[in-house]
Structures are given as C-alpha cells and as structure tokens.
Amino acid sequence: MSRLRWLTAGESHGPALVATLEGLPAGVPITTEMVADHLARRRLGYGRGARMKFERDEVTFLGGVRHGLTMGSPVAVMVGNTEWPKWEQVMAADPVDPEVLAGLARNAPLTRPRPGHADLAGMQKYGFDEARPILERASARETAARVALGAVARSYLKETAGVEIVSHVVELASAKAPHGVYPTPADVERLDADPVRCLDADASKAMVAEIDQAHKDGDTLGGVVEVLAYGVPVGLGSHVHWDRKLDARLAGALMGIQAIKGVEIGDGFELARVPGSRAHDEIVGTPDGIRRVSGRSGGTEGGLTTGELLRVRAAMKPIATVPRALKTVDVATGEAAQAHHQRSDVSAVPAAGIVAEAMVALVLADAVAEKFGGDSVTETRRNVRSYLDNLDIR
C-alpha cells in the first residue's frame, strides 16, 4: 500500500502550479533554493524553445515546511508563472466580458487539433469545441510541479537511506551513447553542463548535430533517457501483487510523463533477444556479501529491489507541436487544415531526464516510507540501518 500521496494542479498559462505531498516524516531538509535548483535543471538542454529563455519558476512553500525542515504534515508547494499577467483574462477563473475576450488574440479558439497531442480526444471526451481547456493541462509545463515534489523526495531518500539519483541522455534521434557507461552522482555537474546531458563527448556532438538538422528541417526529435539510483536497499516493493511490484510502479510513473511512449527496466527489450544463459544476473559470494555479477535486470527481480544499481530507461517520442505543421481537420468547419502551431522545442529529451529523476524519486520515496515507516527522519534512518544490519542473508 502506498505510504506517500501526491497531486498537482494548475494550467500551463495559469497563475501557478501547485502540488502537495503527503506522508513524509518530520525533519526532511528542504528549501526553496533546493527546489529552484532542480527546476532550473528542467529548463536545460540544447534545442529548447523560446519559452525556456523567459520562463522563470517562482517557488513558494505553502505548508508542511518550517525553517528548512518538513514538519510531518502535508507539504504544499506553488510554482508561480511569471507570464501570468499576459494571460490573466484569457485564463481567468471568473467570467470575463465576452467583448473583452473577443479583442484578445490569445483567446482565439484553437479549432485545429494537433496530431500527437491530447487535443482532439480531449475535446471529444469533455465536449469542448476548442482545444485550449485540454492543452493547458496536458502541457509539459505541469512537470514543473512534479520536479518540485521530486526535490523533496530526493532529500528524503538521501537523508534516510543514502539513495542518490542521476540521469543522462543515451539516445537522441539516431545518435546513441555507448552502452554500459553509467554516470554517478559525482557526474551531475558535468552532465548538466553538457548541451544534451550526455556523458560521452562524441555522442553529445552527434546529438547536437541531429538537433541542428531538425531545426533546419522544421522538425522535432525524440530520444531515450536513463535514470540510475545508487544506494537503493534490497527489498523495496513486493512479489505478492501486481500493483506492489516496484518495477511496475516505476514503469507507470515514467509512462505518466508527457510524450513518454516506452519504458524498460535494466536491459529491458534486449533481454527478449538473448537466451536465458545470457539474460540473467548470476549470483556470487564476495567479501562484501552476496552480489550479482552483472546488472541486466536493472536492480529489480520479481518486483523487489536487489540492492544493486537501479536502472530504468524511458523513450520520449518527438514533440508533437511540429513547426512544419501536420495535417488535421478544423473542427469548426470540418475542412482539412494544418495543425495549430506555437513556439515549441526541437527536442526536450534532456529535460525529460530531470522529470524522470523526479518520478523515480517519488516512487522510491514511497517504497522506502512503506518499508521503513517512521514519523521522523531519525526514526526512518534508524529503521533502515537496523534492517540492513540484521539481514539474515547478506
């Protein structure tokens, strides 16, 4: 059963995003600066659109934190939208004079749904005659709220169990980084300084070249990010039920990120292409205890963490707002048309890695809280240490 609960609210061009996280113990260190640092990382990446140049994330804690520490009550955080004054009437919660709205270009009905977005299916489901009410919430801007909560979860994981999380881009379009080269937490600063957050210099150059070409072609690109969690204790999750398996929870969380269309744990789909003798991680005795000689499983077996490096990948499709504009139908007229286009990224794969880090952090934080409990960080930390010290099989 989940110990933590989280929820976000807000629209892309609304006054703010808000998020709540319930179930954390007292004593987790967190400040607005810590959250702002991760939100700034979310704006990184070569190929981002103009919005990243002027978008600023104003972080305010509304509850659950006092003097830099959680209090054991629900944590509420707000990420303000500095562009709100431009949208105050278009996105107002209260009714606005129709004559005022009619004179606003930003309020023009969006009746040409974009292929690859939630536009058309959302309009059909909720009965809207234009896409604005759908795209405002479906926008990847919402991930800023999840990154904010992820910052809190990361602090909890590090303080209680010593878990640290890092991500990198392993594929962007046809450019690929060498397989099996895994960054550590010590590489984060170097990764964030790279234009595409890739550890391999040659692969990074190839990825930048792919983005440049796509920009010239009026196109967009997807890719694959890999998230690694170091220090994850053995035994998180469960083999008992499908919804308690940790890899299932990780996959669901990552698939919930906008534009993610595939997830694999460890070597994932590659394991389907090799015989069993080459697919599994053999177990050996070492001076440090019983270990696995490889990491093909990605640190989970049977829905449980193994104590080895946790490794997951997420595949992001190309951004659906394509500059060259794809074919669609204008729902107001029924005529063939080109899809609505606004400023967009050529690629947001590097940023997807930061969002994926946050989601992995939230899932692992939930699993740690579920396994070890505790009303304070001190109590949880003590429970973790006691568990690890008293494992019957090491």
UniProtKB/Swiss-Prot annotation:
Reduced FMN (FMNH(2)). It catalyses: 5-O-(1-carboxyvinyl)-3-phosphoshikimate = chorismate + phosphate. Signal peptide: none annotated. PROSITE patterns: CHORISMATE_SYNTHASE_1, CHORISMATE_SYNTHASE_2, CHORISMATE_SYNTHASE_3. Pathway: Metabolic intermediate biosynthesis; chorismate biosynthesis; chorismate from D-erythrose 4-phosphate and phosphoenolpyruvate: step 7/7. Its cofactor is FMNH2. InterPro entries: Chorismate_synth, Chorismate_synth_AroC_sf, Chorismate_synthase_CS. NADP(+) binds at R42, R48. GO terms for biological process: amino acid biosynthetic process; aromatic amino acid family biosynthetic process; chorismate biosynthetic process. The keyword RNA-binding does not apply. It comes from the Bacteria. GO terms for cellular component: cytosol. Keywords: Amino-acid biosynthesis, Aromatic amino acid biosynthesis, FAD, Flavoprotein, FMN, Lyase, NADP. GO terms for molecular function: chorismate synthase activity; FMN binding. FMN binds at R137, A138, S139, Q258, A259, G302, K317, P318, I319, A320, T321, R343. Its EC number is 4.2.3.5. Belongs to the chorismate synthase family. This reaction introduces a second double bond into the aromatic ring system. Homotetramer. This is Chorismate synthase. It comes from Streptomyces coelicolor (strain ATCC BAA-471 / A3(2) / M145).
